Structure formats: structure tokens, C-alpha cells
């Protein structure tokens, strides 16, 4: 049995806490809403973020981060990307020694365009870091909460660390593979949110299956192109954290990014969409970060650029589709050299 603190009591943090508790670990979860923590402790449910799911009674919720981190040397962080530095700065006050830092957030830090593992390594002193591990893959919290079969990837620079996290989570309904490509795994999980937003727009516009299939395929090419330029293994993008996560996020009604895009495609403004969602839509911030990265690194990402113009420059979604369809003709295999 391992003592683990889950930092972040949203839908995904709560679902992962459930997996760990099902495996017999000593699980604590922290959130900044005291009434929500009380509900988890007394009613064993998180009605705001994971309604309808009965949580194991062994999960103990805290609204005090200091109390939640007592005698813990494994932490799992699942908070919005924009909150990471602030949360990490608080956490390092209370972590006592070398700790395994797992993160399961899919995004890029706004403003710096850094991967979350980079943010952790910047904010946490070396003597408090045993390993940094990423948990990512095609996994909606709603289905994990129902204990439906789910498969994800544990990635770390040190494979033994990835395997240790694999062992923490593996059970009859939650399968975990390992991968040493922490860069590719993080970027696949973050960048697919951009394509999911665009896929939602195509569905909102009623463009049909042909358009959506093309968008997803060419979107994966963009993800792999930028990922390779940043040091990721191109094979990673054909796996669970690339193609797998892209498929589930572009096709499921559980996907916040798809739902947001669908509303945009039906004519709602970005402000209306974000207000109605009630939860973080990482793809919006990631689109901005990825667009800036692509320009800086001189990587061609036409879908990302078109979505950026829709979200931040007020471009019409139909005009964006037209601009993509009207691009200069190309050979499909022109992208291949970038991926080898």
C-alpha cells in the first residue's frame, strides 16, 4: 500500500483517486472547495465534477494542502495548466523529501509554452524530486468512474519510474503501458485538444464524416510534426497518447473540447461557449501556445493557425474551412521526412 495525494478534485483527479483506492492504496485528495471535500468525505461522491459515481469510502479529502501532504512521497497533480506554478509553489512548502511527481493534465503552460513536466522541474527543488512521470491517454473521467475498460500510458525519463506508476494504477479495468518518450506523450495529450476543438466545429457546421476524418488525419500530422521538432519520438504519436487520445477526444460527447467546438460551429461566440461549459477547455489556451510555438520553430500547422484566427482574431468558422480547403495543392507524403 502506497500513500498518495491527488492534488485537484475535478472530474479526472477524482476518477484517478478512485482507481488508486480500488487498488488498495492510502489515497488523499485535495481541492480548494471545502464543501466539495466535505461531500467526498461524508457522502463519498463528487456531485459537481463526477456526478452519479459512488467513490470508495477510503478516499480522504482535504481542503488544507499542508494536511493532505503529510508523510506522502507520491503525488498526482491534476489541475488546469494555468494553475500549475501557483500550486507547485504551495506544495513544495509541505513536501518533506524525494517525491515522485505524477501529472495527468493535458496542456501547455500559457505564456511560456512549456510542457508541464518542465514546469515541475523548474518549480520544485532537485532534492524534492525523485521522478517526474506523466500519465496520459484516451480516457474520459466519466467512463473511468463507471469502471469501464480504459488504457493509458505512463511516461518518464527513467523507465523504472514509469513502471512503478504503471504498477500503482494497473487493475482489471485500468490498463497502463509505459513509454520513455515524456516529450511526445505530453505533446500528444496537449495538442490533440486543438484538433478536438476543430472537429467539434466541423460537426457543428454539419460538414459530415469525410471532412472530420480528413481533419483528424491531417491534425495528427500537425501534432507529430511539431512534436518531432521538439524532440518527441514520431512513433509515440501513432500510439495511445497520440492517435488514441485524438480519436476519443474528437468523437465523444464527453469531450469538453469537442463540445466547445461544436457550439462554435453552431454560431456561438467564444465567450458564450466558455461561460456555458463551467469547466476548463484546455484546447483554447493550447491553441494559442501551439500557434506561438509553431511560428517560433518554423513548423507548418495550418489547422492550428486557422483555429487560432477563429478563437483570437474573430475569423468566421466557415471562412476558416474555406481557407484550409483552398490551400496550395500538395503531396500527402510531403510531411513524411519531418517524421523520420
From Swiss-Prot:
BP-aspect Gene Ontology terms: carbohydrate metabolic process; glycerol-3-phosphate biosynthetic process; glycerol-3-phosphate catabolic process; glycerophospholipid metabolic process; phospholipid biosynthetic process
Active-site positions on this chain: 192 (proton acceptor)
Binding-site residues, NADPH: 11-12, 33, 106, 141, 256, 280, 282
Keywords: Cytoplasm, Lipid biosynthesis, Lipid metabolism, NAD, NADP, Nucleotide-binding, Oxidoreductase, Phospholipid biosynthesis, Phospholipid metabolism
InterPro entries reported for this sequence: 6-PGluconate_DH-like_C_sf, 6PGD_dom2, G3P_DH_NAD-dep, G3P_DH_NAD-dep_C, G3P_DH_NAD-dep_N, NAD(P)-bd_dom_sf
HAMAP family for this protein: NAD_Glyc3P_dehydrog
Protein name from the UniProt record: Glycerol-3-phosphate dehydrogenase [NAD(P)+]
UniProt organism field: Bacillus anthracis
Upper taxonomic lineage: Bacteria, Bacillati, Bacillota, Bacilli, Bacillales
Amino acid at each position: 500500500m502506497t500513500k498518495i495525494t491527488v492534488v485537484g478534485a475535478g472530474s479526472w483527479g477524482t476518477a484517478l483517486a478512485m482507481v488508486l483506492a480500488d487498488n488498495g492504496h492510502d489515497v488523499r485528495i485535495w481541492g480548494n472547495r471545502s464543501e466539495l471535500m466535505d461531500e467526498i468525505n461524508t457522502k463519498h461522491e463528487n456531485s459537481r465534477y463526477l456526478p452519479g459515481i459512488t467513490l470508495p469510502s477510503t478516499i480522504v479529502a482535504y481542503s488544507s494542502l499542508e494536511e493532505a501532504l503529510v508523510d506522502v512521497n507520491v503525488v498526482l497533480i491534476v489541475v488546469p495548466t494555468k494553475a500549475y506554478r501557483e500550486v507547485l509553489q504551495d506544495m513544495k512548502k509541505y513536501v518533506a523529501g524525494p517525491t515522485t511527481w505524477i501529472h495527468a493534465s493535458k496542456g501547455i503552460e500559457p505564456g511560456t509554452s512549456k510542457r508541464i513536466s518542465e514546469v515541475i522541474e523548474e518549480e520544485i527543488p532537485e532534492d524534492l524530486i525523485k521522478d517526474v512521470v506523466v500519465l496520459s491517454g484516451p480516457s474520459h473521467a466519466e467512463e473511468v468512474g463507471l469502471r469501464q475498460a480504459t488504457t493509458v500510458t505512463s511516461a518518464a525519463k527513467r523507465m523504472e519510474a514509469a513502471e512503478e506508476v504503471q504498477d500503482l494504477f494497473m487493475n482489471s479495468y485500468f490498463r497502463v503501458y509505459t513509454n520513455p518518450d515524456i516529450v511526445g506523450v505530453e505533446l500528444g495529450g496537449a495538442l490533440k485538444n486543438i484538433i478536438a476543438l476543430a472537429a467539434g466545429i466541423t460537426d457543428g457546421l454539419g460538414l459530415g464524416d469525410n471532412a472530420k476524418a480528413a481533419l483528424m488525419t491531417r491534425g495528427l500530422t500537425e501534432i507529430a510534426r511539431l512534436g518531432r521538432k521538439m524532440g518527441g519520438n514520431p512513433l509515440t504519436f501513432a500510439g495511445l497518447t497520440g492517435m488514441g487520445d485524438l480519436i476519443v477526444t474528437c468523437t465523444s460527447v464527453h469531450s469538453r473540447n469537442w463540445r466547445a467546438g461544436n457550439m462554435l460551429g453552431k454560431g456561438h461566440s467564444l465567450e458564450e461557449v466558455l461561460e456555458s461549459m463551467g469547466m476548463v477547455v484546455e484546447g483554447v489556451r493550447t491553441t494559442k501556445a501551439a500557434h506561438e510555438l509553431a511560428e517560433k520553430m518554423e513548423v507548418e500547422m495550418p489547422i492550428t493557425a486557422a483555429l487560432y484566427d477563429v478563437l483570437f482574431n474573430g475569423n468566421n468558422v466557415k471562412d476558416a474551412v474555406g481557407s484550409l480547403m483552398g490551400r496550395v495543392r500538395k503531396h500527402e507524403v510531403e510531411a513524411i521526412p519531418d517524421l523520420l
